[in-house]
A protein has these predicted regions:
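Domain-level signal for soluble alpha/beta catalytic cores
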Residues: 1-339
Length: 339
């Protein structure tokens, strides 16, 4: 029996698009130039993912900069304290802001616009993502956390609006990327119940298959928390029984692999998409090792409820890394098909 394969969302950036995407995020392209660039990049990403044999694919998330480092540009209610470094190397290089009013995105966060732009490209788009309510104000999250916390209900409404927009436009799978929420639970900053309540509210009224992605962060291969665990996330997922259809979970670290038995408590209503293959590791995981890992996870949740995925972060890589990333995906697909 073959195991279904997917990716988290972002796809690698090709050399012929690197400079143009940098200009897009710098705001030096015209709207027409940006639109043409994003269509060109997404078209290539969709074709590549399909050619590699993935069962589910995205538009590549080329409208995003380092996952969420661009989102302050869509928001009102923030004042920039320190702009991002010209080259983002670590978490202290991203934009820093403070809250000065109601945080909102009158023109949207860009995710629904991206899906509408990409859905009719050759091959279409099988899944689309939106950042979680604590991920959206990342520029102010650590510099003005108490002020951000007071606006969580409004941030949930903002994210919900974006998710519903994607679903209403016809996307088969709508995914919430609750990276910060997952990290806060791992670090003890948030309870599983608190995280689950926020996630469930984000999906209120969303008429599509619902996926949730949780991870420990990755920026140039670096996690953002020290507790590289996955077991605490099961407590979140148990509270989302009947809400979430697919749990796309980072399990690439050996410490997470050792906690796999906890996932026997995953609700029967959910599929587990196990993020086994590590995009950040310079080593190309052999087919044999990936197959062994898939088998071990299948013994926990059952083959019929298991998908396999890479970890998130493809679009944080320079184009010179593409041969390694591509081989990782090829090996994952082969391992999943030959289990």
């Amino acid at each position: 029996m073959g195991i279904r394969t997917t990716v988290v969302g972002s796809w690698w950036i090709h050399a012929d698009n690197e400079q143009d995407l940098a200009r897009h995020f710098a705001g030096t392209l015209t709207p027409a130039e940006s639109e043409a660039l994003l269509i060109r990049a997404a078209t290539k990403a969709i074709a590549e993912q399909r050619d590699l044999g993935l069962d589910d694919w995205s538009g590549g998330e080329y409208h995003t900069d380092n996952f969420i480092c661009h989102l302050h540009r869509h928001l009102t209610g923030l004042e920039i304290i320190r702009p991002a470094e010209s080259t983002i190397s670590d978490y202290d290089d991203i934009t820093v802001a403070r809250v000065v009013g109601k945080i909102d995105a009158p023109k949207g966060l860009g995710y629904a616009d991206a899906y509408k732009r990409e859905k009719d490209l050759p091959g279409g788009v099988r899944k689309a993502n939106v950042a979680g309510p604590l991920d959206v104000p990342i520029a102010a999250l650590f510099s003005d956390m108490e002020a951000v916390k007071k606006q969580v209900p409004g941030l949930i409404s903002l994210v919900n609006r974006e998710l519903r927009g994607i679903a209403d436009a016809g996307c088969p799978v709508v995914q919430l990327d609750a990276a910060v929420e997952g990290q806060f639970v791992n670090a003890g900053f948030m309870t599983a119940q608190h995280a689950a309540d926020a996630i469930a509210a984000c999906f209120e009224g969303v008429k599509a298959k619902k996926a949730l992605h949780v991870c420990n962060g990755t920026l140039r291969g670096r996690p953002s928390v020290g507790a590289l665990r996955c077991a605490p996330w099961v407590e979140i997922l148990q509270r989302l029984d009947g809400v979430i259809d697919i749990a796309l979970v980072e399990v690439k670290y050996f410490s997470q692999y050792q906690e796999r038995e906890v996932f026997k408590a995953l609700p029967n209503s959910m599929t587990l998409a196990a993020g086994i293959v590590d995009e950040a590791c310079y080593w190309i995981e052999p087919v044999k090792k990936i197959r062994e890992r898939i088998g071990d996870w299948a013994r926990v949740v059952g083959e019929e409820r298991l998908w396999v995925s890479t970890s998130c972060g493809f679009n944080r890589h320079p184009s010179r890394n593409i041969p390694v990333l591509r081989q990782k995906v090829e090996n994952m697909v082969e391992a999943a098909r030959t289990l």
